[in-house]
């Protein structure tokens, strides 16, 4: 009887530790680090550094950004399983480019839903081959990935995890379709490829509309403690929005 009680107590302790575990787990080219509560940032250093996010919910996990390829998605999943054994429920394609949607095939293979706006899904369907070719031009080692479309498509803004993960569109910027993802309880904003330390690649950007999109974001007056940049160093305060707006206003318009 005592042994059984001890086993139950130990199992409960393991569950409790898993529920409140914080810190960072790492692999060769990737890390998963707690930002606040159930919100974690992924620093993916394969190809060109990109930063994605993971939300550990009560019933399962939401991944924000599919990562570069099925192989990098698999690496992220290994890190996720070191934090929680709960299933990955869904993965958000935050825009139609390879760094945000290249891992779709892996996530679908484990039964996760791949989620996007209709605008992102339509751009993937029409322009995926072009985006892969563009990626391979700069990164010859990048694989020639086939198109894997999202299987859950929203006509506009959407929420997941019972409102604890909010995805919204503010206008064209780095791409025509890019969305922000906001975690209201933690006051964390994921800037996607729209916000980052450096100006970055503007090949598909609407440079003229970009500042207006950032002004619309600021007009929402979201309570924000932390902004996660989509590339470069991930952790910033809300001042990253004004910082990038100044960069884009100074950029040449084609």
Curated annotation (Swiss-Prot):
Activity regulation as described: Competitively inhibited by mercaptophosphonate and pyridine carboxylate derivatives. Also inhibited by the binding of a second zinc ion and by chelating agents such as EDTA.
Protein's job: Confers resistance to the different beta-lactams antibiotics (penicillin, cephalosporin and carbapenem) via the hydrolysis of the beta-lactam ring. It is able to hydrolyze penicillin and imipenem, but is much less active against cephalothin, cefotaxime, meropenem and ceftazidime.
One GO BP: response to antibiotic
Keyword match Zinc: yes
CC cofactor note: Binds 1 Zn(2+) ions per subunit.
Signal peptide annotation: 1-27
Official protein name in the record: Metallo-beta-lactamase type 2
Reaction(s) catalysed (UniProt annotation): a beta-lactam + H2O = a substituted beta-amino acid
PROSITE patterns per UniProt: BETA_LACTAMASE_B_1, BETA_LACTAMASE_B_2
InterPro entries (alphabetical): Beta-lactamase_class-B_CS (IPR001018), Metallo-B-lactamas (IPR001279), NDM-1-like (IPR050855), RibonucZ/Hydroxyglut_hydro (IPR036866)
Organism: Aeromonas hydrophila
Binding site for substrate: 135, 174, 196, 201
GO cellular component: periplasmic space
Binding site for Zn(2+): 99, 193, 231
């Amino acid at each position: 009887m005592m042994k059984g009680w001890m086993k139950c107590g130990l199992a409960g302790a393991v569950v409790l530790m898993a529920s409140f575990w914080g810190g960072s787990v790492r692999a060769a080219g990737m890390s998963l680090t707690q930002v606040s509560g159930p919100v974690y940032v992924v620093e993916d250093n394969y190809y060109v550094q990109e930063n994605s996010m993971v939300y550990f919910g009560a019933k399962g996990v939401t991944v924000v950004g599919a990562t570069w390829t099925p192989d990098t998605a698999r690496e992220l999943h290994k890190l996720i399983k070191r934090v929680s054994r709960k299933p990955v429920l869904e993965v958000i394609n935050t825009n139609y480019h390879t760094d945000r949607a290249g891992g779709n095939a892996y996530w679908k293979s484990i039964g996760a839903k791949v989620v996007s706006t209709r605008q992102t899904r339509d751009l993937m369907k029409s322009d995926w081959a072009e985006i892969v070719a563009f990626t391979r031009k700069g990164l010859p080692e990048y694989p020639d990935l086939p198109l894997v479309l999202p299987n859950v498509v929203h006509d506009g803004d959407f929420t997941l995890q019972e409102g604890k993960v909010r995805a919204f569109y503010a206008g064209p910027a780095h791409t025509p379709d890019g969305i922000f993802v906001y975690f209201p309880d933690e006051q964390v904003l994921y800037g996607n490829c729209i916000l980052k330390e450096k100006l970055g690649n503007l090949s598909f950007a609407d440079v003229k509309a970009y500042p207006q999109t950032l002004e619309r974001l600021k007009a929402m007056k979201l309570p924000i403690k932390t902004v996660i940049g989509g590339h470069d160093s991930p952790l910033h305060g809300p001042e990253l929005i004004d910082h990038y707006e100044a960069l884009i206003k100074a950029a040449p318009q084609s």
